[in-house]
Amino acid sequence: MMIGSTEFTFDKGCGEYVGKLQVWGRETDVFLDTEHAEGESIDKIVTEKINWIEHNKEKIVKAFMEENDHYVDVVNEMIACGDFKADGPISADDFVNALFVDNVTIWVKGVDTDFALDLDAEPDYLLGHLAFMEIDNQYHVEFGGLNG
């Protein structure tokens, strides 16, 4: 299956199409669940959702930080104790600027298409975890917990 100029291949292990697209300036794994797609233009739907992620980084990060701004203090405590290597304390901006999209999953269902993404950080301010962000078909963003 082609999405734009990118080939997505079916992965029997996960039962989804898998490909790589640019999200927030990085090549990102994208998983497509097309089980409930009924003749829709999958290419159009996927492109719309990826473009929405591209243009709504601030909204996604804000939804994450509303429930997780304490991570800045946690990392700073770890830096002070020598448990996290850094040149000095980090700010909230440092934390936010370290976030990137690790992967995206899109459940293609026409107008009911919803999607999710995992945020990661470099440096690893999430301490080996990924932040699961859920986005419904009305583009409401919600933090769904930490993975890993």
Residue spans for each PLM region:
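Long, contiguous N-terminal structural blocks used for assembly/anchoring
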Residues: 1-86
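Acidic, proline/glycine-rich low-complexity IDRs
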Residues: 1-10, 14-18, 97-99, 103-148
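Amphipathic protein-protein interaction modules
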Residues: 55-125
